[in-house]
Amino acid sequence: MANFYTDNPNIKFYLTHPLVKHILELKERNFADKDKYDYAPENFEDAMDNYERVLELAGDVMANVVAPNAEAVDAEGPHLENNRMIYASKTYENLDATIKAGLNGVTMPRRYGGLNFPMVVYGAINEMVATADTGFENIWSLQDCIETLYEFGNEDQRQRYVPRVCEGQTMSMDLTEPDAGSDLQSVMLKATYDEKEDCWRLNGCKRFITNGDSDIHLVLARSEEGTRDGRGLSMFIYDKNQGGVDVRRLENKLGIHGSPTCELVYKNAKAELCGDRKLGLIKYVMGLMNGARLGIAGQSTGVSQMAYNEALAYAKERKQFGKAIIEFPAVYDMLAIMKAKLDAGRSLLYATSRYVDVYKILEDIERERKAVGDKLTPEERNECKTFSKLADAFTPVAKGMTSEYANQNTYDGIQVHGGSGFMLEYACQRLYRDARILSIYEGTTQLQTVAAGRYITNGFYGTVIADMLQTGQAPASVGTEDWCAAEYLPLKEKCAKMAEKYNEAVAYVNAQKNDEFKDFVIRHLYEMAADIIMSLLLIGDASRAPELFNESAKVYNRYAASEIERHYSFVMSASADDLADYRK
């Protein structure tokens, strides 16, 4: 039988990264749970064995339940009955299978019924879910919203809500509205305090809410009368059991048909405050969105994987002019580029996940110590600060680049299929439709470049690249100077030359002292930094496992070099005077 984990050694490879041992020891608090729970690991090897078992189970469920259901779910989709959303029939089968497999509350502590797995392991499961069915991944992965409640809610809220998610109840994040999409500070859903009932009441409309009829909602609402900016917004928890929210309509979408996208009407719905007032957008949603963006990077990687799988299988099978089409340079070129982009994006995904793991776990440890009058050591505080900055810098790059690559790979996947790819009988058309949203929701690629912008202009990505050239890792202190195998030293030297051009382009843009010009060319600088970082990551991967990454490291390095030339040429030949040609 197929298995999306055991059939894909590239996923397992990222669980062997040297930093994973440190992450695991932090997450397990040096295995303190072994005396409290009989299923808690006793040591590193025991924990890795546990991860392996769960990942194999997840790979089996995704390959043999969720993936075979994908076409039926896409065809049926959800529907409305009496202002309630009803999933496609096979979606319930998928949910039941993931609940029975224990694939909920993956990152939550054991004391709430969670698995207490780090983000790198959650990310591996998430990628496999997306490989099986992109739309179902939306429903399953929204359990990640519980991270925000766990982090910012109080202990009573944790005890009431976290176990429910660990048991398989669903979540949603209700942020956007008809007049507040990317511009979330314009949210106007009204929250008023009900003194008699000692609760908050929510009134208004939310639009484009993924899985909007979920069991537990995190809701961004305006709690401060008379405000119109982000400082008047707070985060609330709405429990579907309380009633007061109707699903007015389901969006009729191009893709991800199995994932219900809802318009919600809040009618004096009872809710409770999560965290402090006024911090809903400026603190809590920013944390929520960073987690969601990393989730989309995993979703995008899963889509790229399935697009490549389908294209490769077809190219081997389809014969023209007396031979399989994979033997034609025009076809194997496309397939090699697809694979290189897939591998580069995946390496970036897991690098980002490692950064998120370290700082998030250290923040959790800090909360635990603070509760007993203790604190992090100076070394731990410095590590938390370093990895938090890296996570903040890498997340918009991971989300943006993997989602763009998913779109490119599904496009090329159809091209490999030729005319057959345009027919509904082949899965490649569904993947193409599903991929289109990936570079739009949870922040468009254009917004990801904005989020990354300060790390471009202040030289941070340049420092990251310099560290990676030195030891293969950022920060340089977690790597080693012999990181690059001799065979790949020429690729490393090409990256060094790319870095020179990147730094020159950044210096040129900064010297213009023109914000509009900077915004105009920032996408080019963003992709230059991403291309170099991903090429260096793949060189490191190939140095450790040439049997898995040799070809992709070489192909991507050539691809990155050509992309650097293209972006460099555009930036260095442009000026603020040129903007008049583009404005309308």
Question: Locations of the language-model features?
Answer:
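Extended, charge-enriched "interface" segments that sit outside catalytic cores
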Residues: 1-81, 85
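Alpha-helix capping/hinge segments and adjacent helical runs
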Residues: 2-5, 9-10, 19, 256, ...
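A glycine-rich, basic-preceded beta-loop-alpha segment at the flavin cofactor/substrate interface
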Residues: 36-39, 241-244, 248, 260-292, ...
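Internal helix-loop-helix
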Residues: 59-60, 89-167, 210-212, 346, ...
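C-terminal amphipathic alpha-helical interaction region
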Residues: 91, 459, 475-584
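A structural-propensity feature for long, helix-poor, extended segments
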Residues: 154-160, 444, 450-499
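A short core secondary-structure module
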Residues: 199-245
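C-terminal helix-coil-helix/basic helical segment that borders enzyme active sites and/or dimer interfaces
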Residues: 343-399, 506-520, 539, 543
